[in-house]
């Protein structure tokens, strides 16, 4: 028996939420001449002696280790992930859920940068890069280091996140008691139809990246909070704190209310029953550039906590050109696509530059795996400020539209205050909440399935363009759509149950009567037979196994059950 025969028909058991898989062959920095972005090149020519900027330093590799040591390091890295994160990754990447991209940066490389006297901002294991603050001389020396692959300037935010305030929608369509003035923004994208079916986002974990969050507002009294982190000050306080600009947490508070608000008769969020991860990633201070590196750090953090959806009302264009909006150039776009590869649905605002000289979407909205949200008014007409596509390489953007004009939102000026505001920032959490409902209804769906469903059922699905994308999101219709390839993703075959999930030291296997005759066999990843266990000759059977099986090292084992699908079991002790 060859282990790979079981991989195609596997059920996953997570033991203590920890995973081991082969090291993989992820490439991080291409050999050859270093690539210095044009913006850094121009700065090096004109910078004064003491002037400093934020720079991404990309490394060529993550250090030279023997294969066995590399596998052990990946195993240790995987052990820090929430069981929900492991399960999500196994659905998205069943053959290689973890690889070298999940390893921390190589410490000797960081020590070499530290020796140059630079200030570290943050680190990205996915990009194999560190963001630093350096002057001209330091930048030149770092560019000459042999392990450095490339340098790129850290980008700033595209425009202000502050919404336009409007008194009322273009036309008041009507209200229902429960939803109050938030009725239309939810009804337009068919969220109410899913609420009526009982879907509120329960059990779905949503991460939101923004300027901060004031949870003292009444609409968050029932918030199911999993974790929060301030990436600017590196603490767990996402509300305003000493040193923050006035209004720092306002934009994030308003966006979160569209997702998680629970004020019956006033405001209800699209996914008020979901679990939330809050990341404060944007500093609104005028004197300090608001940059993409904290967004990337937040994405890696949210991934480790088991986020299934990222809602980001932030986008970045400083130091980029339209040619960079190709889905491959911006570091933040690469990170967003990596999150999607890991099974997270990334929902991002298109931007509010539709009527500006830069009229296009901004990173990471150019990502091919990113759901990009444009804005319409209450009548479904595109907002003039909504940034447009296509991407530089010709892909249709935005993906879909939602109401982003005169939205009814929580007002951070008071614990029971509400207001209206506009921007693609507000279309985004509505769509992210709707997608959380889709994932509650279809827990096996992956990002690609979600994208297929919402584009196939949007109001302009038959004629997408660079202004509306595939049209206004129709969440209920998407929930009734059958994306391709879903059946092959079922990791819970009938006739075989492994539990508890997760477990610490032992697990049980329940087999139905419909199986072949013969022993249960246990193999390691090389195909070596570790053990055989006799089964009852017929009828339903329960087999209790201890994770400390003789000869079983931490990592993956495979179970072969006669006449049934195999099982892939993950063990760490």
State what each model feature region is.
Residues 10-23:
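Bacterial N-terminal signal peptides
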Residues 30, 48-50, 68-69, 150, ...:
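Subtilisin-like serine protease catalytic core
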Residues 68-115:
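Aromatic- and Gly/Pro-rich amphipathic surface segment
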Residues 107-186, 192-195:
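Autoinhibitory propeptides
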Residues 183, 305, 309-311, 440-493, ...:
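C-terminal subdomain of the subtilisin-like protease fold in secreted/lumenal serine endopeptidases
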Residues 255, 295, 307-410, 455-459:
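Catalytic-core segments of hydrolase enzymes
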Residues 256, 279-283, 402-468:
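Hydrolase catalytic cores
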Residues 489-499, 503-573:
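C-terminal outer-membrane/trafficking sorting elements
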